[in-house]
Amino acid sequence: MTASKDDAGASDDHASLLEALGVDVRPDLLRLALTHRSYAYENGGLPTNERLEFLGDSVLGLSITERLYHEHPDKSEGELAKLRASVVNMHALAEVARGLGEGGLGAHLLLGKGEELTGGRDKPSILADGMESLLGAVHLQHGIDVARGVVLRLFADLLERGPRMGAGLDWKTSLQELTAERGLGVPSYEISSTGPDHDKEFTATTVIGGRAYGQGVGRSKKEAEQKAAGAAYQALTAES
């Protein structure tokens, strides 16, 4: 795929990305998978990666659900759902996306100028959507068996960590369950921000029973709160 003058922020060398995926993807299909709606709208209404994202979401969900079903025959439907939530969520997808190829998936995305200016290449929501789009593209070209193999390889670490992490990367849920078990009440989050409106950075502090347990920093309040909850979860479990 050759970059145009409007693709300046994106890498036009996708060898490392394809190597990380472990499969080849046709240039036209790969370009579609990398085309965020912001870029499409700024370039005459090109097709976006949203349909591939829709497909990839199902591929990911089926692959992870099937693996969990077979690996944990002793767990209930509710427990399996929680394990799946530790892998199939925005933050988990973004984590995997950041490890894809040189510079991560974000370096390869086609974004509009607005997203480019506001740090879109590292936004968890954009990375997660792009990850699902890539999985959709792999499925479309190679079929479900190959796509499943890609999913299970890329998400192997998260699948292994999930059973040890409660609700996993949904740290706020994990933390709330932990504090309820210990009779500590419901955690709250204090938020502060720095920087201009188009490039804000948020800091969240987790407060439990009037005591600060952990901080997190992110480009959105939600991301900062998740990180702060994770820090608090680790601190609480270390106390036990």
Swiss-Prot record:
The gene is rnc. The active site is at residues 57, 132. The lineage of its organism: Bacteria, Bacillati, Actinomycetota, Actinomycetes, Mycobacteriales. Homodimer. GO terms for cellular component: cytoplasm. This is Ribonuclease 3. Digests double-stranded RNA. Involved in the processing of primary rRNA transcript to yield the immediate precursors to the large and small rRNAs (23S and 16S). Processes some mRNAs, and tRNAs when they are encoded in the rRNA operon. Processes pre-crRNA and tracrRNA of type II CRISPR loci if present in the organism. The keyword Signal does not apply. Keywords: Cytoplasm, Endonuclease, Hydrolase, Magnesium, Metal-binding, mRNA processing, Nuclease, RNA-binding, rRNA processing, rRNA-binding, tRNA processing. The keyword tRNA processing applies. It comes from the Bacteria. It is found in: Cytoplasm. Its main location: cytoplasm. It comes from Nocardia farcinica (strain IFM 10152).
